[in-house]
């Protein structure tokens, strides 16, 4: 199983606690009492920060406690401390019910308004002054408040005068940060949260070496040793299984502890107030506080140049093809949403439920993901976020060395010089004016029907699919739509074209404005590529070929292409049919990275000057070499004559 995770404290080396509340609720006395272990006779209104030593609590982490002012005049200081805090203690006085009311009428809403994400501990101070005639229990009082404000981790009452539960306040504060219950357990539904269930299921699968769906005694002991450093004796093992079987009948079978039983153990840890046990297991298995694998466990190769890209190796692609077939239970060549959910059931979330992946791949009319769509999604995720790709591969059971997962492509500048490329994944930027047909092109690429209704693309959009090339080879093509209103800003980035294998500029062949804007974009792409050394092959696409072209459109576009040295526009209509030949042509263009690169007049002059300079240098070099050779021959002749 994957070990080498963080310590039980999640890798933290310090903790900062902000103590806040109404004036006179006992904030400063509480801090002074925990620091000195005595009740202070005289306490200043606001104490300076105090640090408790690392050995004060079991996790061996120093805790800095910050007192905060209650007055409105110091509001800026208070907000600053809230933002810096790892945990917030909100105090009220047990002998002043109005201060308890102020928690829900002011302090808790204020923390939400400020978007403070730190957990909250509610602390009742001056317990020694509570009116003993009041029958209300703390649980009864706080239960409705905690239901409304889920950020409250726990509530506790204490007395600085008698030192009752004073250390416990800060123990619970550290526990709320280092071993929080909130990410693990849904208090309202009284069940484990989905992310924890997914992580626990993955850990169970890693421990189930014989894949029989249960953990036998040997597997349970391996798990115990890996996480806690010591095995359980037979009596302890029997005791664990007995507790599980009493509360979760399907948690134990003749084969051992089942997944429901394993999940029940985590519920039991939390029920008994021991979330630190659950966190110790999670962190030992590499999980962070968000219940995701730590980045340090997910090494990805570094690109040395922006015109390189990262691809999955054949080994990783073979694994993905196999996992697709494993979860395609009905063998229809596509994963239904339920089958895809099952595939990612051991990942924190399904990675393709959000942009840019949500609508980026080919699906069947019923909404199932095809094998091409499945592999294309992985190629897209690897291109955009290789660490996320590796994480999700790991979640679903890929156990190979990360070094065999990815390959870093050669620089495109080198590909141009060698006039060939070894890439399997190509990225094409799709530029063009509004309403030119960019989105329709991407829809067609994914096999979607043409729609007459226009919907502007608000952000960048991706579409990925597998293209069958002549000779039987398969390449993955990723189209990236760049909205017109983002082109200018996009191209100001010096490395904007580094990742682009082919730039496609789409225009409405029936609209003169659309053509002029497309020409402007094409010239800008060409100019930027020349300036920055990222010369990009370009294709012009004359869309909406089913409409009447504007006069002189063909002649103008052909002339511009001839001047730039690129192919004449590809005419097509997404309305009349799928432009599959265009996508194959884009891939073919990408496979010949030295061709179809537009050259402006300025670029042509620069090239001529470079050639002239190089020729001059060559002439001078040759002349110099001839001169030296002649001098050497003369000296040799003179030497022989004198001899």
Curated annotation (Swiss-Prot):
Activated by calcium. It comes from Arabidopsis thaliana (Mouse-ear cress). Induction: By abscisic acid (ABA) and NaCl. CDD domains: Miro1 (cd01893), Miro2 (cd01892). This is Mitochondrial Rho GTPase 2. The chain crosses the membrane at residues 612-632. GO terms for molecular function: calcium ion binding; GTP binding; GTPase activity. Keywords: Calcium, GTP-binding, Hydrolase, Membrane, Metal-binding, Mitochondrion, Mitochondrion outer membrane, Nucleotide-binding, Repeat, Stress response, Transmembrane, Transmembrane helix. PANTHER family: EF-HAND CALCIUM-BINDING DOMAIN-CONTAINING PROTEIN 7 (PTHR46819:SF1). Its EC number is 3.6.5.-. Residues 1-611 are cytoplasmic. Calcium-binding mitochondrial GTPase involved in calcium signaling during salt stress response. May play a role in the progression of embryonic cell division, development of haploid male and female gametes, and pollen tube growth. The lineage of its organism: Eukaryota, Viridiplantae, Streptophyta, Embryophyta, Tracheophyta. It is an enzyme of class 3 (hydrolase). Expressed roots, rosette and cauline leaves, stems, flowers and siliques. SMART domains: RAB, RHO. PROSITE patterns: EF_HAND_1, EF_HAND_2, MIRO. Its main location: mitochondrion. Residues 12-179, 423-592 form the Miro domain.
């Amino acid at each position: 199983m994957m070990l080498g995770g963080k310590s039980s404290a999640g890798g933290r080396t310090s903790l900062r606690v902000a103590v806040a509340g109404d004036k006179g609720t006992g904030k400063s006395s509480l801090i002074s009492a925990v620091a000195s272990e005595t009740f202070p006779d005289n306490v200043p209104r606001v104490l300076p920060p105090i640090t408790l030593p690392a050995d004060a609590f079991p996790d061996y982490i120093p805790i800095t406690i910050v007192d905060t002012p209650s007055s409105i005049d110091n509001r800026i200081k208070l907000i600053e401390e809230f933002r810096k805090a790892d945990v917030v203690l909100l105090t009220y006085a047990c002998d002043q019910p109005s201060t308890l009311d102020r928690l829900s009428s002011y302090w808790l809403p204020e923390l939400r308004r400020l978007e403070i994400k730190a957990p909250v501990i509610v602390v009742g101070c001056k317990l020694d002054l509570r009116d003993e005639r009041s029958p209300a229990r703390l649980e009864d009082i706080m239960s409705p408040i905690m239901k409304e404000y889920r950020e409250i981790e726990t509530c506790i009452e204490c007395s600085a005068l008698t030192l009752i539960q004073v250390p416990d306040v800060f123990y619970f504060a550290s526990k709320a940060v280092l071993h929080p219950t909130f990410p693990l357990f849904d208090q309202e539904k009284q069940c484990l949260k989905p992310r924890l269930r997914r992580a626990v299921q993955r850990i169970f699968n890693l421990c189930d070496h014989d894949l029989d769906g249960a953990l036998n005694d040997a597997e349970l002991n391996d798990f115990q040793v890996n996480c806690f450093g010591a095995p359980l004796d037979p009596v302890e093992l029997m005791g664990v299984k007995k507790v599980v079987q009493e509360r979760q009948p399907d948690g134990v079978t003749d084969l051992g502890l089942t997944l429901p039983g394993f999940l029940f153990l985590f519920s039991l840890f939390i029920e008994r107030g021991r979330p630190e046990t659950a966190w110790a297991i999670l962190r030992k298995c590499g999980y962070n506080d968000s219940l995701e694998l730590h980045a340090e466990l997910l090494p990805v190769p570094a690109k040395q140049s922006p015109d390189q890209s990262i691809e999955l190796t054949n080994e990783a692609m073979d694994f993905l093809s196999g996992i697709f077939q494993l979860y395609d239970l009905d063998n229809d060549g596509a994963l239904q949403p339920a089958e895809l959910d099952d595939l990612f059931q051991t990942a924190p979330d399904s990675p393709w439920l959000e942009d840019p992946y949500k609508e980026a791949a080919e699906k069947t009319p019923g909404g199932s993901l095809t094998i091409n769509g499945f592999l294309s999604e992985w190629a897209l995720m690897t291109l955009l976020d290789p660490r996320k790709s590796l994480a999700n591969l790991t979640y679903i059971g890929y156990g190979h060395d990360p070094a065999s997962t990815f390959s870093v492509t050669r620089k495109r500048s080198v590909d141009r010089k060698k006039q060939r490329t070894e890439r399997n994944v190509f990225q094409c930027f799709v530029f063009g004016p509004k309403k030119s047909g960019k989105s329709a092109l991407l829809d067609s690429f994914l096999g979607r029907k043409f729609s007459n209704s226009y919907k502007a693309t608000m952000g960048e959009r991706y579409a990925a699919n597998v293209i069958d090339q002549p000779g039987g080879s398969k390449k993955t093509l990723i189209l990236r739509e760049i909205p017109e209103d983002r082109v200018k800003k996009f191209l100001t980035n010096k490395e904007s074209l580094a990742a682009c294998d082919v730039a496609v500029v789409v225009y409405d062949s029936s609209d003169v404005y659309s053509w002029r804007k497309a020409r402007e974009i094409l010239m800008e792409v060409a100019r930027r590529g020349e300036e920055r050394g990222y010369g990009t092959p370009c294709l012009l696409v004359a869309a909406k070929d089913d409409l009447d072209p504007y006069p002189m459109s063909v002649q103008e576009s052909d002339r511009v292409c001839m001047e730039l040295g690129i192919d004449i526009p590809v005419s097509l209509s997404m309305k009349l049919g799928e432009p599959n030949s265009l996508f194959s042509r884009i891939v073919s263009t990408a496979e010949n990275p030295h061709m179809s690169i537009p050259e402006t007049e300025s670029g042509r002059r620069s090239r001529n000057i470079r050639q002239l300079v190089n020729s001059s240098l060559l002439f001078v070099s040759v002349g110099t070499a001839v001169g030296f050779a002649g001098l050497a021959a003369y000296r040799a002749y003179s030497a022989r004559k004198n001899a």
